[in-house]
Amino acid sequence: MKNNWLTLKSLFLCVSALSASGLILSGCTENANLNVGEWSLEYDAHANGIDISKGSKLIYDNVYAAYKLADSVVSTRDYAKHHVSTKKINDHFGEGYHYEVTYTGNNLPVLVQSFYVYPTKDYVLTDFTLESTSEMASNYMAPVNVDRMPEVLNQGENNRALFIPFDNDCWIRYQSHPLTFTELTSYEVTAIFNNDDREAMVIGSVEHDSWKTGITIGKGNIYNVGSCLLYTSD
C-alpha cells in the first residue's frame, strides 16, 4: 500500500459486566490515565505502551503498535516523542472517549495510536494511522502487540484458544485448542476462554479494506497464553 495516510482498526473485547460512571482524567509528561466506567487506560512513557485494565484486573500490558517500513519493522517503541490527548466522542458505537497518543521523531512517519472507550460497552476499540509528507509504503500493520499477556482467565486446565481458518482454506476446520501450543494463528478473530466458567477474551478486526487479518498467540502455559499479536498484511 502506497499513500501518505494508512489506517487500521481492530477490536478488543473482554466479556464481563460493565458499570457506567463518569470520567477521571489525569496527565503529565511521563504518563496519562483515562478511567471510564470500569475501564482504565494508562500510558507508560518508558515502554511507549498502553496498559488496559478492567476493574482491578490488568487485561493488556504495554500494548504497542508496529508496522513495516521498507525492510524494517518499526514500533511505537522506536519513537522519541509522544503526546497524549483525550476527547469526548459520540459515534455509531455510542457515547465515549477517544484516547490518542501521537508519536513523532527519529525521522519516522507520524504515528497516531487511538483507543475508543465506551462506559456502557464491554470492549475497547483501537486503530492507528501513519502520516507523512512524502510517499511511503507498507504491507504490514499491527495495532495490537503484547509481549507478555497478563493472567486474565481463572486458572484451570480447561483454558483454551479458538482457531478460525483463513477464508480461502477449505480443508481446515474451526477448532479450540488447549493452551499447550507453541504458536497459534487465527483468521480475523480469536477467543481465549475458560471452558468451565465460559469467561473469555475476544480479539479481532472490526474493519479493513483488502488485507487479511491474523491473530498470533505465543506460548504461555496451560493456564494462560504468552504473547499476543494482531496484524494485517497483504
Protein language model features and the residues they cover:
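Acidic-aromatic substrate-binding/catalytic surfaces of carbohydrate-active enzymes
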Residues: 32-101, 105, 114
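Conserved small/polar residues in nucleotide/adenosyl-binding loops
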Residues: 231-234
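Acidic, contiguous internal or C-terminal segments within carbohydrate-active enzymes
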Residues: 97-153
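Bacterial N-terminal signal peptides that target proteins for export
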Residues: 2-14
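Bacterial N-terminal signal peptides
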Residues: 12-22
